[in-house]
């Protein structure tokens, strides 16, 4: 265990500890919880409430669900066009968090036709969280999301449109996967819930963080292809599974292994002993292209690692984590030595945000408590909210269902694999999204069949819970005009709720717009207060720093600041103080001509 005593009493650590505890949610959470409670009480008193209405709309939906291809397309198009329709009220997101800017750096790099960028001359002023500066200037994350966002930038002028399209494909793939495991009507319902609870509002679609849409798409393809392959062994299902495995490898390979390992075991058993398996020659012919795709993807990832990090066997994350972090990713790993931080904001992020949690997990009570809390927020709350919690009361019945036995047996492996990680955020579970939906919908089927004293209370409750999800989505569209928007980090817990973030990042975007409208090239030197929240980072740049209209740099000591200003002597130099009550641009203060600029750090 590593001591954090010098930092444990900082204001930042105090706020981080408060924000990570279970606390009352904002108005949207309270409204949904209230409606869920009312619905439960109503069905106990009037178990047939709304039956005439629901009985009229369910048959045509069931007929649609039986047309499986059309259902999948409808789910994907609904996710796409509904999100576009609400753009006037729910705008294209601005980058806000450290992860956002890191993924956008990858997208910009790929859009420039490069796999990495050379280390800039003044790199110590540009150091930031979740990026590497040496051996190259690059995002620390796996390249999959960056490649997709680069396509969005090149094709549509904005990387978010690629996120939107990928999110729509994710919702469609979830519906397609569910069709292989559940009756068609329930698969369509699952796809609709994916649109309402993930595709429209969650941070998966409305930030640039995580690439969840890509790993969830990959997981859905793998889990959806498995039963189809074992039934028909068609070439297309093998290719879809291979595409899913590649997507997992380019986004979240650790979780991808947790998902793919039991799939490989079951598939291998079928290949050896399955009664309906095709002849070996046919299998080899049909497996050649999928296997070649996977091998090519692994080779390309090795080449990318070589270009970006200097070694084909050095995976993304490794350089940045070894350079800046103390806490490792898994409980069995020892803590890293204390780095020599050049910037106090980065020191506080890696110590107050990460190391305290690492130390807590190294006691038995701490491990149990933190693990339960992580899964409560990242799995239960994110995927169920409050409206979808009641079906989980009958979740134990799912454990005995033959239909989903494979997914039930996978669940302990997935949970154990995630529990040994130091951190757990909902997008870490993205590869398992389709599986989680299948298990949750099966619990909902059991609730629908619940008939206390012969009355259809369960049927009515399921209908009302789905109605609540639809109503809450409508309310979320108008959340900003109604002043129901979720609070910003670190006060809010919007990352763990379906309603997602509000309109964050406006201050930095406003300052950057001002700078871009000025004639000539600009250099913005950022001075933080001692109590700055490191997650609200402003110092991020494009792939080509020296060629950018606006450069963001950290203020350091006076001599380093002077070197920076002299290097960019053709640029107008500005001071930006993000923590001041009124954020505005001001000329960077110089002591006198030819002297070192004054530094807030030396006052």
Residue spans of the language-model regions?
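Perimembrane helix-loop-helix junctions
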Residues: 225-228, 258-298, 302
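Signature aromatic-anchored transmembrane alpha helix within multi-pass, membrane-resident enzymes
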Residues: 71-73, 260, 264, 288-295, ...
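Transmembrane-helix signature of polytopic, membrane-embedded enzymes
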Residues: 174-198, 216-217, 230-240, 401-409
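Hydrophobic/aromatic-rich transmembrane helices and adjacent perimembrane loops
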Residues: 103-104, 211-212, 251, 257-258, ...
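Transmembrane-helix motifs of polytopic, lipid-linked glycan transferases
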Residues: 158-182, 220-222
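Membrane-interface transmembrane helices that cradle and orient dolichyl/undecaprenyl
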Residues: 148, 179-182, 214, 222-240, ...
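Membrane-interface alpha helices of multi-pass inner-membrane proteins
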Residues: 150-151, 177, 190-195, 225, ...
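Hydrophobic, aromatic-rich transmembrane alpha-helices
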Residues: 42-44, 171, 266-267, 273, ...
């Amino acid at each position: 265990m590593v001591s954090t005593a010098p930092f444990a009493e900082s204001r930042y650590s105090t706020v981080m500890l408060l924000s990570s505890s279970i606390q009352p949610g904002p108005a949207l959470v309270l409204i949904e919880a209230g409606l869920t409670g009312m619905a439960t009480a109503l069905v106990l008193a009037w178990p047939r409430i709304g039956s005439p209405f629901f009985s009229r709309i369910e048959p045509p939906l069931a007929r649609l669900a039986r047309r499986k291809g059309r259902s999948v397309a409808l789910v994907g198009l609904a996710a796409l066009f509904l999100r576009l329709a609400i753009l006037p009220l729910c705008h294209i997101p601005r980058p806000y968090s450290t992860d956002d800017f890191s993924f956008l750096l990858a997208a910009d790099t790929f859009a420039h036709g490069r796999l990495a960028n050379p280390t800039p001359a003044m790199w110590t002023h540009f150091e930031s969280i979740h990026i590497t500066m040496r051996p190259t200037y690059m995002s620390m994350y796996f390249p999959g999301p960056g490649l997709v966002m680069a396509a969005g930038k090149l094709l549509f002028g904005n990387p978010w449109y690629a996120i939107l399209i990928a999110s729509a494909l994710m919702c469609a793939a979830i519906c397609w996967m569910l069709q292989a495991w559940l009756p068609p009507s329930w698969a369509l319902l699952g796809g609709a819930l994916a649109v309402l609870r993930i595709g429209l509002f969650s941070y998966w679609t409305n930030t640039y963080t995580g690439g969840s849409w890509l790993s969830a798409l990959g997981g859905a393809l793998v889990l959806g292809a498995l039963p189809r392959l074992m039934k028909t062994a068609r070439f297309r299902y093998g290719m879809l599974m291979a595409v899913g495995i590649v997507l997992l490898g380019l986004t979240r390979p650790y979780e991808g292994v947790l998902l793919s390992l039991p799939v490989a075991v079951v598939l291998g058993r079928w290949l050896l002993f399955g009664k309906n398996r095709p002849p070996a020659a046919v299998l080899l012919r049909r497996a050649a292209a999928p296997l070649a795709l996977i091998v090519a993807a692994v080779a390309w990832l090795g080449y990318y690692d070589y270009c970006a990090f200097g070694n084909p066997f050095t995976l993304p994350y490794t350089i940045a984590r070894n350079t800046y972090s103390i806490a490792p990713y898994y409980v069995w790993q020892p803590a890293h030595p204390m780095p020599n931080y050049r910037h106090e904001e980065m020191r506080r992020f890696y110590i107050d945000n990460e190391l305290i949690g690492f130390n807590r997990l190294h006691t038995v009570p701490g491990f149990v408590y933190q693990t339960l809390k992580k899964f409560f927020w990242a799995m239960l709350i994110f995927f169920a909210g409050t409206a979808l919690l009641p079906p989980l009361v009958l979740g134990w019945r799912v454990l005995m269902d033959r239909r989903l036995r494979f997914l039930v047996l996978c669940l302990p492996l997935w949970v154990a694999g995630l529990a040994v990680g130091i951190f757990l955020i909902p997008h870490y579970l993205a590869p398992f999204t389709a599986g989680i939906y299948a298990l949750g919908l099966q619990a909902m089927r059991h609730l629908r069949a619940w008939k206390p004293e012969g009355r259809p209370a369960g049927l009515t409750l399921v209908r009302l819970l789905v109605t609540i999800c639809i109503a809450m989505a409508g309310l979320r569209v108008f959340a900003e005009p109604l002043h129901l928007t979720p609070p910003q980090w670190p006060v809010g817990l919007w990352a763990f709720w379906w309603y997602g973030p509000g309109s964050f990042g406006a201050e930095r975007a406003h300052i950057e717009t001002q700078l871009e409208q000025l004639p000539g090239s600009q250099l913005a030197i950022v001075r933080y207060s001692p109590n700055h929240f490191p997650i609200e980072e402003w110092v991020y740049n494009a792939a080509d720093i020296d060629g950018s209209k606006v450069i963001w740099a950290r203020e350091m000591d006076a001599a380093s600041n002077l070197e920076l200003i002299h290097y960019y002597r053709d640029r107008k130099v500005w001071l930006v103080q993000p923590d001041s009550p009124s954020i505005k641009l001001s000329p960077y203060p110089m002591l006198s001509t030819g002297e070192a600029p004054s530094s807030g750090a030396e006052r």
